[in-house]
Amino acid sequence: MKARLAFHDKQVLADGSIVEMKIWELPESARGSKHRLKYSLFYGWPGRRLVGYDNERGKGDHRHVQDKEEAYAFSTPEQLIEDFLADVRRSRGES
């Protein structure tokens, strides 16, 4: 079984910034992760990430906020999306 795209949502906001979320189901867990999901969540402009969550092979679950990278404690896809959108709102000064 190859990776299957389980969720994809992309929005271009009024200021031209992009919020894009992709989650794939994998046949087995990726190196560095304890779950069978691969994900890439992005907020920013082309070429300029302000907030990002991903689990790049070998790095495991982590997030980027501005220029800071830190480990992320993945629990569920729903919580992942909730945490990401909360960081997006904070980055936009909305909360």
Regions found by a protein language model. Give the residues of each.
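Short, compact, well-ordered microdomains
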Residues: 68-95
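Residues at secondary-structure transition points
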Residues: 64-66
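The feature represents the first ordered module of a protein
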Residues: 1-62
